[in-house]
Amino acid sequence: LTSTSTTTETREDGSKVTTITKPDGSKTVTVEQPDGIKSETVTTKDGDVTITVTDKNGEELVKAEIPATIPEPETKFEDLDTTPWAEEAINKVAGLELVNGTGENKYSPIAPMTRGSLATVLHRLSQGKTDYESTFKDVAQGRYYTEGVAWAAKAGVVKGITDEIFAPEQTITREQLAVMMARYAKLVGLNTKADAKALDRFTDGDATGTWAVDGVAWCVQNGILKGKGNDTLDPTAEVTRAEVAVMLDRF
């Protein structure tokens, strides 16, 4: 490439995508969604990525900086021998400070992840603001997840069990995690169009909740969510902290 190239496209959902590629290999992708959400993803020639997302009023929802080289985590976890398949991913997400340990050099990889914890992880990934007010009655001020839940609800990444109840201490299921990941992907400008047929390869794909089919299918199609063996998806199973790390790494 000897000169700057610009391409534009309109997705099926009406989003307008503009991609500017410079001769040095750096790239800027701007996505303007019909609801007014605008994302800009800048990738430098060295592979560092900055993602900025604003809402229809111009308020910044995401200002994420992801280095090409992931730093080593400050803590060397000593309890990852039960989940060797997740060790690399856990160290990556810990290096990015998305997920913390549970104390005394432990990560607790097979412990379940709660809804409040996942909202907090996605908030850290977004590097979004911390001054939103939570509208949920069961999200008290000053809890570790308070800011994360408030941001995630504002950004449309999470929804409550009802309009007033979020259930932050409830464990999250594989299908709930997939839906939240797909919503986050849409927020930052990725094309989240999915084909429900992606679930047909699993013997229990039809056990996926109707509300979750699109999100789960998108995660399956993009290799973020994989089966569990014997061609099962197990969509309603609890998600462990190790599984969350692996899905974030694939994302």
Outline where the language-model segments fall:
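Intrinsically disordered, low-complexity repeat and linker tracts
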Residues: 1-15, 23-24, 34-36, 44-102, ...
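Feature responds to low-complexity, polar/acidic, surface-exposed segments characteristic
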Residues: 65-87, 100-148, 154-175, 181-213, ...
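Interaction-mediating elements
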Residues: 93, 118, 152, 177, ...
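Hydrophobic beta-strand positions in blades of beta-propellers and related beta-sheet-rich domains
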Residues: 29, 49-51, 118, 177
